[in-house]
Amino acid sequence: LDPANAALVPRAELLLYAAARDQHADEIIQPALSQGTWVLCDRFTDATVAYQGGGRQLPSATIETLNRIATDGLQPDLTLLLDLPVEEGLRRAIGRNDQDGTAHEGRFEAETLAFHQRVRDSYWQLAEIHGRFRVVDASGTVAVVAGRIDRVLDEFLAERGIQL
């Protein structure tokens, strides 16, 4: 993610993410699911569709094939899309990177607003296609957004008859 890797071509970026996702699925996700453990994942195959497909404009068929190979077809039961206008999301990401010392991971943050709008549009297209998506308004304080997420999770669990 280091901006120093600016010469990394989009297809190589896609392959690196697919390889990382494959390793993550094999080492972490599948063993946990096999033990009946719930898995929460910050970004998964939808991020590849949005960033490398929408943002980088790589062919969706290629991305779908790589995602399927990397995860053995694993799909989440629920996907939370924390949505913000592009400018606000980018401002927050840059601020977070500066605050936690990961400003060197700013490759995506250095992209154009048009890139980020394509990413957001791609996420919205996924949300319209897949019923597992719940869109959460991410504007407001951390506490406000957390409350919105809590309500979505409560509804999701109630729909499945799960009580915690």
Where are these predicted regions, by residue range?
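Short, polar/charged, Gly/Pro-enriched helix-capping and turn/loop motifs at alpha-helix termini
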Residues: 31, 39, 77, 159-164
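ATP-dependent small-molecule kinase phosphotransfer cores
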Residues: 1-71
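Short loop/turn elements that form and flank the Walker-type P-loop nucleotide-binding site
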Residues: 34-35, 74-76, 129
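Short beta->alpha linker loops
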Residues: 20, 44, 84-85, 140-141
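Alpha-helix boundary/capping detector
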Residues: 22, 26, 43, 77, ...
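Hydrophobic/aromatic beta-strand patches that form the interior of the parallel beta-sheet core
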Residues: 40, 78-80, 134-136
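A glycine- and Lys/Arg-enriched "phosphate-lid" helix/loop adjacent to the NTP-binding pocket
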Residues: 48-120
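NTP-dependent small-molecule kinase module
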Residues: 87-164
